[in-house]
Amino acid sequence: MKFTKSEALHKEALEHIVGGVNSPSRSFKAVGGGAPVAMERGKGAYFWDVDGNKYIDYLAAYGPIITGHAHPHITKAITTAAENGVLYGTPTALEVKFAKMLKEAMPALDKVRFVNSGTEAVMTTIRVARAYTGRTKIMKFAGCYHGHSDLVLVAAGSGPSTLGTPDSAGVPQSIAQEVITVPFNNIETLKEALDKWGHEVAAILVEPIVGNFGIVEPKPGFLEKVNELVHEAGALVIYDEVITAFRFMYGGAQDLLGVTPDLTALGKVIGGGLPIGAYGGKKEIMEQVAPLGPAYQAGTMAGNPASMASGIACLEVLQQEGLYEKLDELGAMLEKGILEQAAKHNIDITLNRLKGALTVYFTTNTIEDYDAAQDTDGEMFGKFFKLMLQEGVNLAPSKYEAWFLTTEHTKEDIEYTIEAVGRAFAALADNK
């Protein structure tokens, strides 16, 4: 494939947009550099770039596009909303209908509030938890991404008995001191941190199924023990289901795993491709939010008719019988094929999969936490990524990200992808 127009467009973008991209994850810095491919249109499971190259898409916009690109039911809903006016600044029937749909899907949501992104949703759940508990410190798990607000851009200190350090320039040390970061899937370290800091902790942020250093499931009993220990400390449990809600099961990870949080942050899939976020939880906690309570949150675009219409339409599609079973079936087929190709070409990989999402790590180690995910071959992944791009298979340009299937992928798409993986692995083996 040739990428002449993408390269020219990136050169122009560098003159006008910081780094040439509007999110750093879109750059190719983590896969050896070069101009990122600029897409022109998408339909179903496919992309076409500005040079006319066609791809099978496993990026799915980092998760939201579960129904494929330009799904007709969602497109019709967005078009109708646009014709009626996309922003009112008033209550609408659409936001009430959508809130009811979310509550029916996720019983832990007694009350809901819409915002404009997953970052906003997480940021506000933290504020609400602090208001409810009267405490200030937050706990999170290492490597789990909860958006780009200051409180969650914090890395672990030197151990569970130390406070965090800023993970980005511009995050003050004073804010990092309010965050305790511990390893995922490690109850003993969590207990040690709670023994020291629990009386100051307002809440713990949890990705119930990790999606930001690859797909990593909790060990059996881990989430139940997190709930027990955190509640014993008088703190709240916040589930960040921005990636997981409606991705693995209609009712989210909390329904799939049978564990209930106090507050939940939502985003990505629930917007049907448009900007959205939402948060909700127990009635007595959510009533801390203005205008009922003292925790302030507002938004000009929050609950806008276009996003509400798109979200409603997306959930209507996902209610169709058999879609999640299809995603699981195709995911299993893809997993089997990739592992067979790795064995055939003597390529060392570990593959983590849950239903229609998976991550290929270039390592032989088991991946259960962030340290293990970091200790994988990023250079090898970068080469693999570029080879797959030439094969017409679009992946996320990072060794940490997942492959996301959509309801529009077919068995033929999976078969082609497995063949492409085989050719890529053969090329990697030849250049070892």
Curated annotation (Swiss-Prot):
Q: Which GO terms describe its molecular function?
A: glutamate-1-semialdehyde 2,1-aminomutase activity; pyridoxal phosphate binding; transaminase activity
Q: Which reaction does it catalyse?
A: (S)-4-amino-5-oxopentanoate = 5-aminolevulinate
What is its cofactor? pyridoxal 5'-phosphate
Tell me the compartments it is located in: Cytoplasm
The organism's place on the tree of life at top rank: Bacteria
The biological process GO terms on file are: protoporphyrinogen IX biosynthetic process
Question: Per the annotation, which location comes first and is thus the protein's main one?
Answer: cytoplasm
Q: Which major enzyme category is it?
A: isomerase
Q: In which pathway does it act?
A: Porphyrin-containing compound metabolism; protoporphyrin-IX biosynthesis; 5-aminolevulinate from L-glutamyl-tRNA(Glu): step 2/2
Give the N6-(pyridoxal phosphate)lysine positions (modified residues).
K268
Q: What is its EC number?
A: 5.4.3.8
**UniProt keyword annotations, A-Z:** Cytoplasm, Isomerase, Porphyrin biosynthesis, Pyridoxal phosphate
Assembly description: Homodimer.
The record ties this protein, via PANTHER family, to: GLUTAMATE-1-SEMIALDEHYDE 2,1-AMINOMUTASE, GLUTAMATE-1-SEMIALDEHYDE 2,1-AMINOMUTASE 2
What family, per the record?
Belongs to the class-III pyridoxal-phosphate-dependent aminotransferase family. HemL subfamily.
Q: Any idea what this protein is called? A: Glutamate-1-semialdehyde 2,1-aminomutase 1
Q: Which gene encodes it?
A: hemL1
